[in-house]
Amino acid sequence: MASSKFEEVRDKVKEFPTQSGVYLMKNTADKIIYIGKAKNLRNRVRSYFNDSKDHSPKTRLLVSNICEVEYILTKTEVEAFLLEASLIKKHRPKYNIRLRDDKAYPYIRFSWGDQAPRLYLARKVKKDGSLYFGPYTSGLAVHGTIKFLNRTFKIRDCTDAVFKSRTRPCMTYQIGRCTAPCVKYITMEDYRNEVEGAKLFLKGQNKKVIKSMTEKMMGAADEEKFEVAARLRDSIEAIKAILQKQAVINDTSEKDQDALGYYGDERGCLIETVHIRAGRVIGTRPHYLPHFDPNDAVEDPREWLVDFLNQYYEDNFIPDEVLLPLDIGNDLTKLMEEVLKERSGSKTTVRFATDERGRNLVDMAHENAKSHFLKYVSKSEEKLRGLEEIKERFNLPERPRRIECYDISTFQGAETVASQVVFEDGVPAKEHYRRYKIKTVQGINDFASMYEVLSRRFKHTEYDDPQLIVIDGGKGQLSQAMKILEEIGRKDIPVVGLAKARTESDFQKQEVESTEERFFLPGRSNPVIFKHNAEALYILSGIRDEAHRFAITYHRKLREGTSLESELDYVVGLGEKRKKVLLTQFNSIDEIKMADPEEIAKLKGFNRVLAERILLQLNESEEEETEVEE
């Protein structure tokens, strides 16, 4: 920041109010680069303009880029916390702690607010009257649990639309897996009582579940209903088998807890959350904070830990208790508890773990954080070497920290769509993915479609510029992209075309198992070819494949509901005959998704490899991504 501008902003800050609120710092391009909250806005913001010796290198860099500071007043400090988290989520400022998480972890959603509740896989916790359990580490594991609970407690698995329109029971009732509440073969009150066991199971109240089912089994045996008794016996054994696989921390606890630990150095910091539900560990979740050193003497660990808690629990399930690895003080503890209560509607205890059981959980989180940090850093260093090779081979002015790739897709004559995929530091940055419906082009015209997409993309000056654009195609597509960038005034951005070299077998319409990726550069006749095991190649081919996948999932979303076959059309290796076999065996796409690989592999024309591919691709569409349409 120029000296005169620095003094101008500093003088302006002196007039800030002393109330609570949120402040927004902007750079010369009027882009928000940092968002913070304060009990006293004037005192907090003025602290940035004190002697820079008291600041960390990151804060000094932030201050040097400040051109304007704005504020929003709030009635309370709790409101400031809530507003800060939502604004950070919306604007993603460069200098705020940004949670790096490769995916949104799945929850089990029990629609308890419905008249006839059912189970779903969910990627977000919403205030919709449902009960949420999780987060879990595997979508397939969640599907397996839902399938188990549906069978054990005879929970309906049909959609709400099917449920409301049925006039006679479906096959699920006929094979004894549902009680047909849709056609009133059971009252809604009795149905809810029947499925109550699944709720207790998910809450960890397993002794109650087993006791209740055992009583029903004995009653059925006394009445000589031996088939019913046998089914209940098998269900009890299945529940016991699942419980034996879970790590038990406290078998008497019914609390939901999260325990936090962290590990890091000058390369970054990894915060680990360990999720304990009713005394059982159901999973762990890593969150990497790049370029943040938790051991820096200038950084206040209480401040960044509270910032993490505020952002993390803006979107995630809030447990009964949060166990911390350090003491954040009474004032911040009470404030954080108020913030969490405001979000969840129920009391959450936040505390520094000092008891033996709590310390053991925090130590577990710390050890997981250390292990994941070392793996992440090793992987990150490989990515940096790959980006450095891209810079050298493509003769770029700087290392391409941000790479964007675009894919134009038209499926079976349907409307044309496009995807924008972003890699930052060599890995997917899904929060920056974008989807486009082509609005100005009729029919198939890739050049006009790409022109529209790039024009719309670069109207957003608030987005960071990429250091490289990857276009799927050879010299022709590269030439078109260069022409478009020149016409929209962005020829300063490097662009490369990615194409596959074909072998002679390709002329015979055979599938090419091994191809050589070729990269075409402006003004160069010969392509750049990387070694087959080069990290640079993994990054570049990875972003191309990701853009293609993301565009296809968009088509799938648009076509959802038009036909059962539409979702199966995208599964590689699945022809018409195999689709008919699947749809004959299973009632719906949801049933296929929840099937075991062994079930599918036993079908005529299927094997284990194909079964796992089908489940992977069908369930892939449920991975949480940033659903932003431009």
From Swiss-Prot:
GO terms for molecular function: DNA binding; excinuclease ABC activity. It comes from the Bacteria. Keywords: Cytoplasm, DNA damage, DNA excision, DNA repair, Excision nuclease, SOS response. The keyword Flavoprotein does not apply. PROSITE patterns: GIY_YIG, UVR, UVRC. Residues 207-242 form the UVR domain. GO terms for cellular component: cytoplasm; excinuclease repair complex. It is found in: Cytoplasm. Residues 18-97 form the GIY-YIG domain. GO terms for biological process: nucleotide-excision repair; SOS response. Interacts with UvrB in an incision complex. NCBIfam families: PRK00558.1-5, uvrC. Belongs to the UvrC family. The UvrABC repair system catalyzes the recognition and processing of DNA lesions. UvrC both incises the 5' and 3' sides of the lesion. The N-terminal half is responsible for the 3' incision and the C-terminal half is responsible for the 5' incision. This is UvrABC system protein C. The gene is uvrC.
